[in-house]
Amino acid sequence: MEFIGHFRRLTAEQRNTFIACFLGWSLDAFDFFILIFCVSALAANFHEKVSTIMQAAFWTLAMRPLGAFLFGMMADRVGRRPTLMLNIIAYSMFELASAFAPTFHVFLITRALFGIAMGGEWGVGAALAFETLPAEGRGFFSGLLQEGYVVGYLIAGLVYGTVFRFVGWRGMFVIGATPAVLAVFVLRKVKESPAWLQGQAWKKSGEHTGQGIWLRVFAFLKNIRSHAGIFIFLVVLMFAFNSFSHGTQDLYPTFLQKNLAFSPGTVSFIVIVYNLGALAGGILFGNLSEKIGRRRTIIVAALLAIPAIPLWAYSHHVGLLAVGGFLMQFMVQGAWGVIPAHLNELSPPGVRGTLPGFAYQTGNLLSSWNSVIQAQVAENRFGGSFAPVLAWTVVVIAAMVAIVTALGHEQRGADLTTTS
């Protein structure tokens, strides 16, 4: 009932804003995970190894910092709302372009361009959401917003299980273009961030009127340098977190398909179950962070992922794998559920539209080769078996998440109503 109470306290404007940001992130993730479910089909179509196909995921992740930088600058300059609309349309169109790639190299280019668009959404959406929502219940909304990523994964799993056999991988990417319609909802129902509007007063003085793009880039980099300590910490933290999520998610459907020879329907069932666990974990741990603190919540969730490894990686029964997956993603996304609020609270007001997303995606860049390395190690050291690689990934990265988090600090309840 407490969860319902948080929503009831929102105004209609705040609800619409949160829904738009949640769906923007969900559908962004949906488009990314379509690739993850189609790895085996792409390998067969383009006559490449799994490790080669995973380069498409690498280029998507590697280009996300550029998107976070460009769209973040745009959000700080012209507003969160129009930037979010452009962002949604862009990632939908590049997803559609992927469906018609005639060769693997062209496919890689479309995925790199998709990565630029994907990289912009999280930072812009999170800034718009948390600058509009009240401070009360921020931990709950942080967990729920981050689990938009899980909802996207869940939708991709449902679509894969029901229509892949009829439309193939190209049809899946065509379906991935449908999120573009969300831009209409943003146009009609969402208002600009009140914090961003308030922050425009200093620009109206004329001091910054007509700034060129390079002057704005220089000003941003100067801001980053003045906050170098927190920026470096956030990048390292996001490297650990992105390795945690992508290391447990990106190759898991391929593990179920290739190592265990499960059908699309069975894979879809397991994916749905563990994403329900992820959704519950993100919301519950996000809410818990309001009571026991951001850092303590992250550390508990990360370390509790380790005991789930035997069921998650070494079971052969569908039911046990589903339980293991549920527990694993409950913890992984439980830790992630704290991040949107934590990063925005730690970020200085003047660069909140850019810094959290840029740090997030820079950390993503550093971890972007993760799935390729996992696939190569499985192919070269374990005869194509993904289980030991997945298991060791969790042990090492969960410990890293806990250690880095413990070394940082938090500003739970910080004022996010101003951008200057």
Q: Whereabouts are the PLM-identified features?
A:
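Cytosolic juxtamembrane N-terminal segment immediately preceding the first transmembrane helix
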Residues: 1-32
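Extracytoplasmic gate region of multi-pass secondary transporters
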Residues: 35-36, 227-279, 367-371
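Extracellular/periplasmic helix-loop-helix junction of adjacent transmembrane segments
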Residues: 36-66, 265-266
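Conserved MFS/SLC helix-loop-helix module at the cytosolic interface between two early adjacent transmembrane helices
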Residues: 66-102, 289-292
